[in-house]
Amino acid sequence: MNVIAIMNHMGVYFKEEPIRELHRALEGLNFRIVYPNDREDLLKLIENNSRLCGVIFDWDKYNLELCEEISKLNEYMPLYAFANSYSTLDVSLNDLRMQVRFFEYALGAAADIAAKIRQNTDEYIDNILPPLTKALFKYVREGKYTFCTPGHMGGTAFQKSPVGSIFYDFFGPNTMKSDISISVSELGSLLDHSGPHKEAEEYIARVFNAERSYMVTNGTSTANKIVGMYSAPAGSTVLIDRNCHKSLTHLMMMSDITPIYFRPTRNAYGILGGIPQSEFQHATIAKRVKETPNATWPVHAVITNSTYDGLLYNTDYIKKTLDVKSIHFDSAWVPYTNFSPIYQGKCGMSGDRVEGKIIYETQSTHKLLAAFSQASMIHVKGDINEETFNEAYMMHTTTSPHYGIVASTETAAAMMKGNAGKRLINGSIERAIKFRKEIKRLKSESDGWFFDVWQPEHIDGAECWPLRSDSAWHGFKNIDNEHMYLDPIKVTILTPGMKKDGTMDEFGIPASLVAKYLDERGIIVEKTGPYNLLFLFSIGIDKTKALSLLRALTEFKRAFDLNLRVKNILPALYREAPEFYENMRIQELAQNIHKLVEHHNLPDLMYRAFEVLPKMVMTPYTAFQKELHGETEEVYLEEMVGRVNANMILPYPPGVPLVMPGEMITEESRPVLEFLQMLCEIGAHYPGFETDIHGAYRQADGRYTVKVLKENTK
């Protein structure tokens, strides 16, 4: 971080000459000097060059107004105002709290001023670094000798082997040196929440508006289990979103709890909807408790917010209405909601604590903020027994955490602190909205078909768009007003083939073809539905990436309209089955898959498959214990009606459990089986289009088997 910007000093000799001297002195201290053309150029520089560490300007020309504009972008940026002895310094005490320092134009003072700028720059870096990261950097710079773990000893061991040296050179020395042992006492402990680790947790809690925050180094899958193990002791009843992440199913397999499922909606596109307001009401819960064997009044509830497709709840309503001691919002996909006003009232940590309740929010820091994979956080509002909670935390946390993951979690919080964090999120929102508008423009100008966007008809400023009962764009039935909102950052592109109400069109392009085309060109889709593709506009998405996606979509249309051969447009798919795809053209492939989907009446089948849940014969915990005792056998998929499932069955997409361990598909819930069979049939007909179904195993003959409990088991 060594870039200093100097604003124009108007060609006045007594001002320019001291600045020339200062330029030379700063270069002698290894600063790089840049000269923005004007105020707008400077502000763009601050937005786009994060290594800028100071601005030098003439007070008479730019004064306090420029300081305020810079502060909106980065309130910690060191500012250096030069003034002559006749300048009017109309600055209040409050203004002086900004990072502005004054110097007088004088020849021969450059060395002293440069030294002060060097000192202020070091203070700036020290000020913006969060506590644990700062302590880790200091430890690495000190280069201490250790006789403890890890065995590679700062990378030294890797360099004793040719292949190890290649590995070392790829990752670099700082990665190696920062991989250290928990025996390093000056860094404190992740498990004991001491020293700089404790300071990091307190820092994160302040940034994320929490009362208590925990860093988790092996993903939100683990964060969810930590919260669940503490909040739902064995023998208790828990309310769980049926569209939960599989980690919540694993929690139910680990702990002997009785689940009662919230029943979310789903539209014709297969987009996961929210849980209706009625599901949170006391009367509905009382009815479910009465209907569920061994159930008692729930002590805990888990809600996925946002949904995979970007739908956020009115969390204020849920906090106020849901009659349980603790509510856990699994917010893995939205770690950024505290940093833009459009998300107020739509996330777990928004607002004040709720009297008599504990609110948890788990977030995958790595998913949409800047952190290493597996970086996750638990935020808490409400009174918990910290010692008992920490037992659950330690149960699921390694005693050898990777400090790079921990520091990246804290650094992600530091990046979101203050105006700079708001600017990052607002930039993501703006890019996503511009992309949406560009898709709509291209659609209106295209000959024939083009892609569409799942969103309201008119989008103007930045907001989360409400799903209303009098609007048709979302495709959901019986929607509650002021309950669900679409996050602009989650962009769902629609392909031709299906109307909003689920009516199948004569012409269609299954989204899986587009996903394969994009993948061949280095663009990875987050989620692919039958006729929709999900793209996440995280803070790492810039204009170049957005334009590359637009270009790829228009190139797909061109290639599709030319009806190119599959082997030319999708060479990787062709290589999977050259004989099958030898003479096939892209339009033939698209129409054949479309007709197969139409034959199964996919929209109606999806509605029916999720309308009636399989029967819960036993809890997931009991089913898993029986599997551990070997009381299972495999049957073909079509034979599972009337059998108790041993494992969860989870098709991807959308990646949420369809059948839970201990559940049985009955005649009433047979559409669940028919939906799974349709997914398998597409893969059987068209090589390369097999659906990944967790819990179903493809055999050599192409048929799928599942694990069920033996019929004589009790």
Curated annotation (Swiss-Prot):
Classification via CDD domains: Orn_deC_like (cd00615)
EC number: 4.1.1.18
Cellular compartments per GO CC: cytosol
Pfam families registered for this protein in UniProt: OKR_DC_1, OKR_DC_1_C, OKR_DC_1_N
MF terms in GO: arginine decarboxylase activity; lysine decarboxylase activity; pyridoxal phosphate binding
GO biological process, alphabetically ordered: arginine catabolic process
Catalytic activity of the protein: L-lysine + H(+) = cadaverine + CO2
N6-(pyridoxal phosphate)lysine PTM positions: 367
Main location as per UniProt: cytoplasm
Enzyme class, broadest EC rank: lyase
Cofactor: pyridoxal 5'-phosphate
Alphabetically ordered keywords of this record: Cytoplasm, Decarboxylase, Lyase, Pyridoxal phosphate
Compartment(s) where it occurs, according to its Swiss-Prot or TrEMBL record: Cytoplasm
Keyword Magnesium: no
NCBIfam families: PRK15399.1 (NF011928), PRK15400.1 (NF011929)
Oligomer status and interactors: Homodecamer. Interacts with RavA.
The family this protein is said to belong to: Belongs to the Orn/Lys/Arg decarboxylase class-I family.
Protein name: Inducible lysine decarboxylase
Species this protein is from: Salmonella typhi
Gene name per UniProt: cadA
